[in-house]
Design a protein with these regions (language model features):
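Alpha/beta enzyme core
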Residues: 1-224, 228-257, 261-273
Length: 273
């Protein structure tokens, strides 16, 4: 798509219902992100989500996706320990989760694992910049690559990942000037997440872009505000149940009059007996 100048659209989502919507909307890639941890499962950060949880949700998304590429996000410690772990767990995403590719966070520190996964025949999407799995190492959720030295390091990591065989690269929370430079220097497409307008594609979390989350980062644009109306719908349901307004006969099933009469007669006969 990069060669044709066509922008890539990627959305992160985690269940069959929303994945079906996203797929039908014409999105190119569905990422089952490790943000499943805090968006859906209620964890404080992405470090807590397990392989089994990721596979479970990837299965649901894959069953919904008819046209979009499904990418499974390798969770924390599913690939860092060894190349063998990396290959095994990446393989689970394809074999069990029915994804077509995996995403791996990190640069030179995970290069051998990325190479091993690629050489095993599994497509890999890279991820540089703000990498949440490395948040403690980098001192928190901050924009990366703001100095010339830090930017050069990210650019070099990007080139190394391309040589290692990744088919695309997510750039998260980096200055737009750096993202533009990386995009220009690489032959593979870049997908921005808070990386400005010059990447080859963009990604947002479904729940952020439709307004289901309470707060969002600066780089998120809300295309709807569904959280409020959804909450109100539940409140209206609660109120109508409490006051007896729901359900009405309109929402009820009916027995034919003859059967009602027969039932009443049977009950009378039973009482006499």
């Amino acid at each position: 798509m990069k060669g044709r100048g066509e922008r890539i659209v990627m959305v992160s989502t985690y269940d069959h219902l929303t994945a079906k919507m996203v797929d039908e909307a014409g999105v190119d890639i569905i990422l089952v992100g490790d943000s499943l941890a805090n968006v859906i499962l209620g964890y404080q950060d992405t470090l807590s989500v397990t392989m089994d949880e990721m596979i479970h949700h990837t299965k649901a998304v894959s069953r919904a996706a008819k046209r979009a590429l499904v990418v499974g996000d390798m969770p924390f410690m599913s690939y860092q320990a060894s190349a063998e772990d990396a290959i095994k767990n990446a393989g689970r995403f394809l074999k069990e989760g029915r994804a077509q590719a995996v995403k791996v966070e990190g640069g030179r520190g995970v290069m051998k694992k990325v190479e091993a996964i690629v050489q095993s025949g599994i497509p890999v999407m890279g991820h540089l910049g703000l990498t949440p799995q490395w948040v403690h190492q980098f001192g928190g959720f901050k924009v990366r690559g703001k100095t010339a030295a830090a930017a050069r390091a990210i650019l070099e990591d990007a080139k190394m990942l391309e040589r290692a065989g990744v088919f695309s690269l997510v750039l998260e929370c980096v200055p737009w000037q750096l993202a533009k430079l990386v995009t220009k220097k690489l032959e593979i497409p870049t997908i921005g997440c808070g990386a400005g307008p010059y990447c080859d594609g963009q990604v947002l979390v479904f729940h952020d872009l439709v307004g289901l989350t309470a707060s969002t980062p600066k780089f998120v644009k809300r295309y709807a505000d569904l959280g409020g109306p959804m909450k109100k719908a539940v409140e209206d349901f609660r109120n109508e149940v409490k006051t007896g307004k729901f359900p009405t006969l309109e929402h009820s099933y009916e027995m034919p009059a003859g059967e009602v009469k027969e039932l009443a007669g049977a009950r009378k006969r039973k009482r006499r007996g």
